[in-house]
C-alpha cells in the first residue's frame, strides 16, 4: 500500500454496506452535508476517508439529540462533516468548541455551514489538539455535555484525561476510529507500515478504557469503530 487509506467501514460485505447506505443513510443525509462530502472528495481524493461516513453521522446526530446536548467539543475537524452534523443537531442556542490545526480544511466546510445558518454555533480554535485542550482547561470554566474525538490516535489517552475534566458527569465522550480499519485483529506484519503506529496506540487505548472505572463504555461497530464513554465520576 502506498500510504492510501482503506475504505472506511469494518463491514466485510460490500453488498450489505451498500444496502445500509442506499436504504437508510443517503436518503436521510442533509443536502448541504452531501454537498460538503462531495466537495471534500473533489479536493482531497482518498484522504476524504478521514471524514465520518454518512451512517455514523446519522448516529451522532441522534445521540446528540437524545442526550439534549447544548455545549459540545470536537477534537479534530478536517473539513467539518461531523462538526456540521452536530451543529445541525444542536438547538439554536447550542455551542460547539472545535479544535484543529488545519484552517483550510475547516474553511471548506464553513461555507456550507454558513449556507445552513449554523455557523454561529461554532467556536473554531486553530491549534493542535493538545494545546487547544490545555487552553480550554486554563480558560473560563465550562461544562460540556458531549465531546467527539477524531484526531491523533497516539494521544487518545491524553485526550481522555483532559476531557474527563471538561465533560460533565453523565456526559458522553465519543472516540472515533477505535477499530482502525479492522487492523486491530491482524498480525503486525499484515498491517501497512503507515497504519501501525495508530494500530498500536488504539490497542493500548482500548485496553485502558476497558478497565477505567471513571467511565461506562460501549464500542460500536459503525464506521471505523466508535467508542462511547459516559463519565461516571
Curated annotation (Swiss-Prot):
PROSITE patterns in the record? SAM_OMT_I (PS51682)
Kindly list the positions annotated as binding substrate. Answer: 8, 150
Binding positions for a divalent metal cation per the UniProt entry: 150, 176-177
Q: Does the keyword S-adenosyl-L-methionine apply?
A: yes
Q: Which tissue types show expression of this protein?
A: Expressed in inflorescences and flower buds. Not detected in roots, leaves or stems. Located exclusively in the tapetum of developing stamen.
Q: Which residues form the signal peptide?
A: none
Biological or metabolic pathway of the protein: Aromatic compound metabolism; phenylpropanoid biosynthesis
Cite the binding residues for S-adenosyl-L-methionine.
52, 74, 76-77, 82, 100, 129, 152
- Function, please? Methyltransferase involved in phenylpropanoid polyamine conjugate biosynthesis. In vivo, methylates only one of the 5-hydroxyferuloyl moieties of N1,N5,N10-tri-(hydroxyferuloyl)-spermidine, while is able in vitro to convert all three 5-hydroxyferuloyl residues to the corresponding sinapoyl moieties and to methylate caffeoyl CoA and tricaffeoyl spermidine.
Which PANTHER family does the record match to this protein? Answer: O-METHYLTRANSFERASE-RELATED (PTHR10509), TAPETUM-SPECIFIC METHYLTRANSFERASE 1 (PTHR10509:SF34)
> Can you say what this protein is called?
Tapetum-specific methyltransferase 1
